[in-house]
Amino acid sequence: KILFITFHKKDDENQPNFYRFTDYLGDLTLHGFRELYGEDVIDFPGSWHLYKDEAEKRKINKDIIWGRGFTYTNILDNFDNINREDIKNKIKSNYFELIVYGSIRRSDLFLDIAVNSKSKIIFIDGHDDTYIEKKFLKHGLYFKREYFETTKNVEPINLSVPKSKILKSIDIKPIHLVAPLIPGKSKTYIYKNEEDYYKMYQKSIFGITYKKTGWDCMRHYEILMNGCLPLFLDIENCPDLTMKNLPK
């Protein structure tokens, strides 16, 4: 069994069941674990916005969720099939072979218990900065997204996309030389649904992308998965250990 500790931050008091701040890396890594290990992966407290049934039940408002939820919401099924009961005691009794902290700098729930168990521990840090929380390194393997300097017990990690989202065949008659969406130009952020957003890249030869706060970004992968070529500005300045698995 694998325990995946997720991060949630409550929005305003009028929407107590909605979590505005998600974590792309944590959410998509959870999806990858579930693809590999199925319901042996227990997400706690539970990333409900990833589940089609639960997101519909809670009437998720995509207008106030990061990136309108494109690519990373509604990618799992059967939220209630996962047994999330008595997690604390299960950690104490070494029920889990592995405990993954999906966003360690936002949530270290049960860590005081986990470090005294026999479970292996993985920490994931998807923040945009290059800071590493070194106090965790003695307890497990630390995966850092914006990674620039070799550090003991730290490994690089990339963002990802669900395989089901990858375009099966490329449009051989694209309309645009360069995709209309220009990162940082708010007036080009006109896409209200995932389908139209994807079609914009599918109908384009190149998609402009570049470093904003951090080097790694969902946009790079959304361009690629829709059969479009990333026109990545200043890619030569990207640290070797950041986006290590992305051809650059």
Stretches found by the model and what they are:
Residues K1-P247:
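Nucleotide-sugar donor-binding catalytic core of glycosyltransferases
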